[in-house]
């Protein structure tokens, strides 16, 4: 290595998946978005993001120029390089990792927190989660990017502010910044921590995708589920953690299974295992992933779990809650 060559340090972070233990739509807002109520659970399974931080050269912000005059897209393009085929969309501006960096820089400018010197960062995405599967993969990537760049660029935004920044990128981004199991309301940005028992899940990822906008517009989608109190949800966790008992359910399941046969097949497969697993199979988000909570009596039976994975109608995994 040349004596004066720039070196880089690497930060590697898990960008975890999430599942919804139940998912209700409680109404439609004036802005067209829907209010939701759900319990998010984070998993020890996900993508990995590697942030290579160059010690030099750095991008320099002209302190004589009003921050409001800074071209955010141009600055973000100077500071951030994406690597990994899955990280690159047809337009880099549409990539959620790039959007996260751009939104973070804009917030730094608005709050006069933009440093004069910023290190350049190469972000490498090691993709494991399927896209559009209800696991929050892209949102998790965006949240991980916000958290790590906030650290690298020494912007010193607190968690509450980062959650507000994340909500501008997507409704599922805040839970990954929150970083723990939570009851969510609003569009998913109003979060209350909840302590849940450790669990393992048999997760199936059918090769199916139903357009989210089409689902929200579907005439048979329930949009007026009664909003439950936070205290009720905390006290009734036995009704949705291992098994799923009314009123807890996923409003999208009947619609998605009617439109996507592969999801219906995966869910029926898991339902056939319920009596042994002692759990209720269900779908996460608006699909297409389905999962089955596993009772402790089966989690140590590796031969049985291997058999279930092998016989599944699509790709299957056994994963654990974070």
From Swiss-Prot:
Pathway: Isoprenoid biosynthesis; isopentenyl diphosphate biosynthesis via DXP pathway; isopentenyl diphosphate from 1-deoxy-D-xylulose 5-phosphate: step 3/6. Pfam families: GHMP_kinases_N. The active site is at 18, 172. Disulfide bonds: none annotated. The keyword RNA-binding does not apply. InterPro entries: GHMP_kinase_C_sf (IPR036554), GHMP_kinase_N_dom (IPR006204), IspE (IPR004424), Ribosomal_Su5_D2-typ_SF (IPR020568), Ribsml_uS5_D2-typ_fold_subgr (IPR014721). ATP binds at residues 130-140. It comes from the Bacteria. Its EC number is 2.7.1.148. It is an enzyme of class 2 (transferase). One of its GO terms (molecular function) is 4-(cytidine 5'-diphospho)-2-C-methyl-D-erythritol kinase activity. Keywords: ATP-binding, Isoprene biosynthesis, Kinase, Nucleotide-binding, Transferase. It catalyses: 4-CDP-2-C-methyl-D-erythritol + ATP = 4-CDP-2-C-methyl-D-erythritol 2-phosphate + ADP + H(+). Belongs to the GHMP kinase family. IspE subfamily. Catalyzes the phosphorylation of the position 2 hydroxy group of 4-diphosphocytidyl-2C-methyl-D-erythritol. This is 4-diphosphocytidyl-2-C-methyl-D-erythritol kinase. It comes from Psychrobacter arcticus (strain DSM 17307 / VKM B-2377 / 273-4).
